[in-house]
Amino acid sequence: MSVITQAQEIPTVAANPDFNYEGDPIIIQLCDRDTVFELSRDQLLGLPESILMCLFPRGLLLDYEIQECQLTQRPLIFQTADFDPSLLQYILNYFQMAENRTANDEIALSPPPPSFPGKCGIILLKEDIEFFILPPISPTTNIAIEVSPNDLLKLKQRVAQRLLQQKKIFDCLHLENSTSEGSAEKNLVRMLCYSGFHEDDEWKRRIQEPHRACITSVTLTNLDFSADQGPVSDPEYFPVYHKLLLFWQKPARKCWWDSSTSITYNGIEFATWVRRVWTLELAVLGANTYETAAV
């Protein structure tokens, strides 16, 4: 089974290609955990689809609201979201920087080939961790040892701190020299490293969700066409960016469990199960059209 599999496509933002959006721009005020972001329609539609799913899990009829605002001459649209503001700010800043470079015809890494459908590609890799602490079984009663809520909270804090310190992106794949070169994990790492990642890269942002045993990590990188080290002289060689285009506005996910973590508390060893979900998506800047669907 591939380490990255295609996710079910969930249309998030409605786009009406027949509507005229010229004139005074409508500002979208997004209240995200008490932090307010002001965005334009293009800024919002330019975000990766997987991030839009996190911001608006029930969908967003954006274009209908824009039309209503223009008809009633209201300048603002108000929306709310439950997503870490620091992660969103990092994503917005990165995309704004890439947009500015694209507008000024600045190529940060390497120019795209003629067959690429835009001026710049941005790879999003996101990891969502949820961890569970399992008390050991008492050898005398054959029943799980009881843990007080206060001790369980301290255990979760320790596990969270340990996971937060594990910043290397690919360490969780447990790749060894003995791992087969044809394994799904090594193929994934090879594809990403042929596109701009490095094997020792760290997550750019890694945070714990408040009051939850969850950790979210995000890394963005520009698609580097010159990093493709495949046999380009082979006429049948399939460039890596063609494979990544399969994830353009179609995020792919892979979920797996990791039981390699344990923690000792008051002389007792507790097993920790970690559920990881990776999301991979490609965003294309300078594309001719937005391929968004109506809810």
UniProtKB/Swiss-Prot annotation:
Keywords annotated in UniProt: Cytoplasm, Nucleus
Subcellular location: Cytoplasm; Nucleus
A GO cellular component annotation in the UniProt record: nucleus
GO BP terms, alphabetized: mRNA cis splicing, via spliceosome
Keyword Lipoprotein: no
InterPro entries xref list: SKP1/BTB/POZ_sf
Coiled coil (UniProt feature): none
MF GO annotations: RNA binding
Top-level taxon of origin: Eukaryota
Entry keyword Nucleus: yes
Family: Belongs to the WHI2 family.
Record's protein name: WHI2-like protein P4H10.16c
Taxonomic source organism: Schizosaccharomyces pombe (strain 972 / ATCC 24843) (Fission yeast)
